[in-house]
From Swiss-Prot:
One of its GO terms (cellular component) is cytoplasm. It comes from Prochlorococcus marinus (strain MIT 9301). Methylates ribosomal protein L11. Keywords: Cytoplasm, Methyltransferase, S-adenosyl-L-methionine, Transferase. It catalyses: L-lysyl-[protein] + 3 S-adenosyl-L-methionine = N(6),N(6),N(6)-trimethyl-L-lysyl-[protein] + 3 S-adenosyl-L-homocysteine + 3 H(+). It holds the Pfam family PrmA. The lineage of its organism: Bacteria, Bacillati, Cyanobacteriota, Cyanophyceae, Synechococcales. One of its GO terms (molecular function) is protein-lysine N-methyltransferase activity. This is Ribosomal protein L11 methyltransferase. The keyword Cytoplasm applies. Belongs to the methyltransferase superfamily. PrmA family. It comes from the Bacteria. The gene is prmA. Its EC number is 2.1.1.-. It is an enzyme of class 2 (transferase). It is found in: Cytoplasm.
Length: 303
């Protein structure tokens, strides 16, 4: 069996730069990373990023460093700011897990990495078991928090739900836990689809009530004639959301609702404007750090 080793990239940032780093890593399709508090300096955080060696040659690594430097608007001595090391595959498979811990979200959810035993004090929570593997995080991104917090106040019982950009499947699992009768998960990455199925199986012991679709949202909707959803969950980047709104409107039933997350605060006004232009009624806007979550509704008399 072929094994692959990993680069581990480490550098320090100001604590308030964490969100913009997360946003850029998600935009680049990089999901294996962690942020560590520095006991001696609360204003700084250590960033650790793991990258498959086979996919990152010297040129790619250099380009990535330039992206980070530009993003942080700094001019550090290059050989002192970034620290690259090589992690063997067998070490990676166990060492990366130490960076994840159970996380409470809102009043009802507990995100539980599958290798950690449940503490009895959390037994009254809705437990979302996650095995993120090497490709996805455990749902600690602020946009995921916002979406889950919004979901816990919605009645999903007997509802039909669409999860766009399902990733690890955390929102699909949450919808099913809250009583959804059918969950459709769409992602253009086969690793994400596999992860969604795996985590659904982990939580429920089967794939009942889950349908998955590989491909871009706009193509999947047209090809499979997906429609009449009670709720649409869309936790992806704002630039991608903008091009999806017309088809999201079409696949919602009358009075159906959509939750958009993955939007920076600086982008929310533009998204709200586009929603209104497409006859979606704004219901609520919530924020967490630099991120916004927007919910909207299709009118009852829409055609």
């Amino acid at each position: 069996m072929e094994t692959k080793d990993w680069y581990k990239l480490t550098f320090l940032i100001e604590s308030d730069s964490e969100e913009i780093i997360i946003w850029k890593l998600n935009e680049l399709g990089i999901f294996s990373f962690s942020f560590e508090y520095l006991i001696k300096n609360e204003n700084k955080k250590e960033v650790n990023i793991w990258l498959p060696i086979d996919d990152w040659d010297e040129s790619s690594r250099s380009s990535f460093e330039k992206i980070i430097i530009k993003l942080l608007n700094i001019n550090p001595p290059k050989n002192k700011f970034f620290e690259w090391s090589i992690i063997k595959q067998e070490d990676w498979l166990t060492s990366w897990k130490k960076y994840w811990a159970p996380e409470l979200v809102g009043n009802h959810f507990l995100i539980l990495p599958c290798w950690i035993n449940l503490n009895k004090k959390f037994k009254d929570k809705q437990i979302i078991k996650i095995d993120p593997g090497a490709a996805f995080g455990t749902g600690s991104h602020p946009s995921t928090y916002l979406c889950l917090e919004k979901m816990e106040n919605i009645l999903f019982s007997d509802k039909k739900v669409l999860d766009i950009g399902s990733g690890s499947g955390i929102l699909s699992v949450a919808a099913r836990l809250l009583g959804a009768k059918e969950v459709c998960a769409v992602d253009n990455d086969y690793l994400a689809i596999n992860s969604t199925k795996s985590n659904f199986q982990l939580n429920f012991g089967n794939l009942n009530k889950l349908n998955t679709y590989l491909g871009s949202f706009n193509e999947v909707i047209l090809k499979n004639q997906l429609e009449q959803f009670d709720f649409v969950l869309c936790n992806i980047l704002a630039e991608v959301i903008k091009g999806m709104i017309p088809n999201i409107y079409k696949c919602l039933r009358n009075n159906g609702e959509v939750i958009f997350s993955g939007i920076l605060n600086s982008q929310k006004d533009e998204i709200i404007k586009i929603l209104i232009q497409h006859d979606l009624k704004l219901l609520d806007v919530s924020t967490r750090k630099d991120w916004a979550c927007i919910s909207a509704q299709k009118a009852s008399n829409s055609t």
